[in-house]
Amino acid sequence: MSNRKYFGTDGIRGRVGDAPITPDFVLKLGWAAGKVLARHGSRKIIIGKDTRISGYMLESALEAGLAAAGLSALFTGPMPTPAVAYLTRTFRAEAGIVISASHNPFYDNGIKFFSIDGTKLPDAVEEAIEAEMEKEISCVDSAELGKASRIVDAAGRYIEFCKATFPNELSLSELKIVVDCANGATYHIAPNVLRELGANVIAIGCEPNGVNINAEVGATDVRALQARVLAEKADLGIAFDGDGDRVIMVDHEGNKVDGDQSMYIIAREGLRQGQLRGGAVGTLMSNMGLELALKQLGIPFARAKVGDRYVLEKMQEKGWRIGAENSGHVILLDKTTTGDGIVAGLQVLAAMARNHMSLHDLCSGMKMFPQILVNVRYTAGSGDPLEHESVKAVTAEVEAALGNRGRVLLRKSGTEPLIRVMVEGEDEAQVTEFAHRIADAVKAV
């Protein structure tokens, strides 16, 4: 069990100006990371960021810390998280660092690391960095200080990588696509990828100003995208989150297509093409309709804990190549090393182009079960509501009523005193009533 002080499951994250996302902390983090990573040989670190205004401050602090430890920084400027993973691999850099808080508001930010092979840093390396942070900063000799430079063609390199994951024999020339880049890191990447593959592209959420990232746009709020798809009579819409590792789509009727549905389309197409190896990994929150649809195709399905980190771990454990969260993280290990919204979106588009089918029709083989989520706040320190007999009794009653055509999932939030009550089944009215019945039991504790 890890007892890390700063690193969570997705790096270090928080509100800018509050510990730990402060200039002095991030400078020391850069120094500590530099001290640990310098032991491994290479002296280059890739640094990318999303479009938050605080990214300028934090990349400068990181660079100063790395330089003091004798490592050189290569800046990409605003760049999707998966692009930093890719560039870290191709530059043979010792590590990649992403400054982003993903789908969070602009006033949050975070730092996460990739290893030389474009995967998450091992826990042992993160723990070594934390241990180094307990020491006083010491500067290497002046002749050994790190330098800083910019990768001027970073965007072009990543655009070509993305295009290479789309089959050469196919084209997007028959598609009108609305793309929503969340005023985030994909704003100068995704529209160009789609246009160069032949699509007629209408771009929204592509005017970042430092404070509008994820603000009523992007994968976490597709209302603007849905409206624009309908207004433009487009074939579909594609939305990314602030750092480009999630993708949510919208069909020509304005219906939202989530990560579960995208994985279903990609897995089914892989099966048809004889390219699917093993099964598919979802999470505890994956829709039961996904599990049943994959079962009908004979594709094995396994659930991991919520979090793309745990999806990847389960994929590696089973030797499978595809995994996803319903929030839009889709991991395709035959294509890349981490969740990549653009690459995942391209595989769905390839299925559309190859089969001459609409996104709506590709989704039709999977019946989504109504899934009701209720958040219940409880008093921290007052005991665990999930262990209370009354909550257990009501949960058991609901599970018995649903039988094998539904699910109940109760879990604590990892960041605040909330119990998340999820009930899933075939009848939306019944599922809603069941979810509120359990939520009321939790509130009464």
Swiss-Prot record:
Q: Per the UniProt record, which EC number(s) apply here?
A: 5.4.2.10
Modification sites for Phosphoserine: S102
Residues of the active site are: S102
Quote the catalytic activity from the record: alpha-D-glucosamine 1-phosphate = D-glucosamine 6-phosphate
> Which coenzyme or cofactor does it need?
Mg(2+)
Which keywords does this Swiss-Prot/TrEMBL entry list? Isomerase, Magnesium, Metal-binding, Phosphoprotein
Cited Gene3D superfamilies: Alpha-D-Glucose-1,6-Bisphosphate, subunit A, domain 3, Alpha-D-phosphohexomutase, C-terminal domain
GO CC annotations? cytosol
**Protein modification:** Activated by phosphorylation.
Where does this protein hold Mg(2+)?
S102, D241, D243, D245
The first-level EC class reads: isomerase
Sorted alphabetically, which InterPro entries does this protein's record hold? A-D-PHexomutase_a/b/a-I (IPR005844), A-D-PHexomutase_a/b/a-I/II/III (IPR016055), A-D-PHexomutase_a/b/a-II (IPR005845), A-D-PHexomutase_a/b/a-III (IPR005846), A-D-PHexomutase_C (IPR005843), A-D-PHexomutase_C_sf (IPR036900), A-D-PHexomutase_CS (IPR016066), Alpha-D-phosphohexomutase_SF (IPR005841)
Q: Which GO terms describe its biological process?
A: carbohydrate metabolic process; peptidoglycan biosynthetic process; UDP-N-acetylglucosamine biosynthetic process
Task: Kindly name one Pfam family recorded for this protein.
Answer: PGM_PMM_I
* Cofactor annotation remark: Binds 1 Mg(2+) ion per subunit.
What GO molecular function annotations does the UniProt record carry, in alphabetical order? magnesium ion binding; phosphoglucosamine mutase activity; phosphomannomutase activity
Under PANTHER family, the record lists:
PHOSPHOGLUCOMUTASE (ALPHA-D-GLUCOSE-1,6-BISPHOSPHATE-DEPENDENT), PHOSPHOHEXOSE MUTASE
User: What's this protein's function?
Assistant: Catalyzes the conversion of glucosamine-6-phosphate to glucosamine-1-phosphate.
The family annotation for this protein states: Belongs to the phosphohexose mutase family.
What protein name is recorded for this chain? Phosphoglucosamine mutase
Q: Organism, per UniProt?
A: Shigella flexneri serotype 5b (strain 8401)
